[in-house]
Amino acid sequence: MSRGLGDVYKRQPIDSCDFSLSHYEADGDEADASFESFSFARVEKYILPMLADAEAAYGGRLEIMLSPWSPPAYMKTNGERNHGGKLKACYWKRWAEYICRYVEEYRSRGFNVTMLTLQNEPKAVQTWDSCIYTAQEEKIFLRDYVWPSLAEHNLTDIDIYIWDHNKERAFEWAETIIDAETDHMVAGIAFHWYSGDHFEALRMLRERFPKKKLLLSEACIEFSKYSAEDNLANAQKYAHDIIGNLNEGMSVFLDWNLVLDELGGPNHVKNFCDAPYLFDTARKQLVERELQSYIKHFSHYIETGAVRIGVSRYTDKLEITAFQENSKIVFVLLNRTQEAIPAFIRLNDTCAGLIAASNSIATGVVNI
């Protein structure tokens, strides 16, 4: 890609999530089993125009992941979108059909939905849209309801990612779900970063399930935990996690929000967060955050189809990842310390010295 972030993967919610303006459902009518009242108007008004503009700027099609935060309130044991609750057993089939309808609505309008998760953060009871599953329940939902519905609608070309929650429990979840019956249904494991690094968990997943893709489906800096003023620290957190994940087998990193307002919203439960761009609504100005430049070191230079290659380092003060594509190698070097650190980049019999400046990130491109 000649310009921009090179960010071609996007995740969109099935119905509302915390970053929606308010709760909404395409069809919240319990009596409407055939979805006669299903309305895509909200998505058409707020989401599709931005996706279309992004594709026009990119000059190609984005790859879109769909994820539900909650089934319609009437389908749940607690009768509301928020505060967890479970999907009632009598609605498992209808909910699977609802998800298929969402995929069809996007695709019928020309948008390239290629990925699907079954539930955002299935172990989290949130003050916003949420729903709880056990690993066994997600397995049954996938095997007996979602996959058959996808097959009925000729949608089995979509990649299904299980889990979609923090890294530290991803291995046990995958162990429960993936077996001889479900292996062909599961393209990979999606994960978030909110409980810490847990790079070892990704290593175990890669070793146990070498043919499954590892995909980070959500990451953002919550202003409830981190300061908006810590622009550099927030950006470094991203780079540290991306490098650690890539080195353990991650193939896609999906940032949660590309653009938010100056408060880190809108968010209907005030769960404000950082983003690569913040839009100042008073001045009508787009403010580029440090996150943008740090993410660009990966998304702009490491192109789709590049293959990760092995690296080693003499000190843990430097973090590095490297990829090869055709006749070039791209490496990204991160120094989060307060000191400049010397380093040598060696490839076969060729060696080049450099200084990694304090609090810096650098990308190198080596023609081979």
Range-by-range predicted roles:
Residues 6, 64, 116, 189, ...:
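Conserved, mostly hydrophobic/aromatic
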Residues 300-301, 311-348, 359:
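Carbohydrate-binding surface patches
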Residues 213-293, 310-313:
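Aromatic/acidic polysaccharide-binding cleft in carbohydrate-active enzymes
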Residues 92, 132-239, 247-248:
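Noncatalytic carbohydrate-binding groove/subsite architecture in carbohydrate-active enzymes
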Residues 10-178:
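Substrate-binding cleft and catalytic face of glycoside hydrolase catalytic domains
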Residues 356-368:
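C-terminal beta-strand-rich structural cap/linker in extracellular carbohydrate-active enzymes
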Residues 1-5, 9:
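Single conserved hydrophobic/aromatic residue that forms the stacking wall/gate
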